[in-house]
Amino acid sequence: MMQRLFLAVVLCLLAPSLAFAQWQDNLVQHHNAQRVGLPALVRDARLDRAAQLHAENMARQGRMSHVLDGRGPGARVCDQGVCRIGVGENVAMGQRTTGEVMRAWMASPVHKANIQGRYSRIGVGYSSGFWCVVFAK
């Protein structure tokens, strides 16, 4: 009985992190599915961190923007050790699923251009209804 209880507690603790990882992978898969004829984007943990921190900051401030606290995507990505020319970013708010946010981005020519751009790496973030995807060459 005690072993079952322990296993149940462990599974409950792991479930959110597993679901989060699945969500991240799913969003990257959606991006790569839209890049027909282009190389697949590769996840980069540093870009994930930049995107996640920005999503959390947007949620905390309750507004969607590429520039918060006077800092844009290039500076935020550089903070994570990826200091280079060729950074792009898509942000969104209000969508409840990865499919919804991808449909919104693909319906916008500017966001679609980022998704189908000449980038090789990607990082994704989400917090309380705010989405952020960062691209780098």
Per-range role (PLM):
Residues L18-K137:
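Functional surface patches built around histidine and acidic residues
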Residues A8-L11, F20:
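A signal for specific C-terminal beta-sheet/loop modules enriched in small/flexible residues
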Residues L14-P16:
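N-terminal signal peptide c-region/cleavage motif recognized by signal peptidases
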Residues M1-V9:
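Bacterial N-terminal signal peptides that target proteins for export
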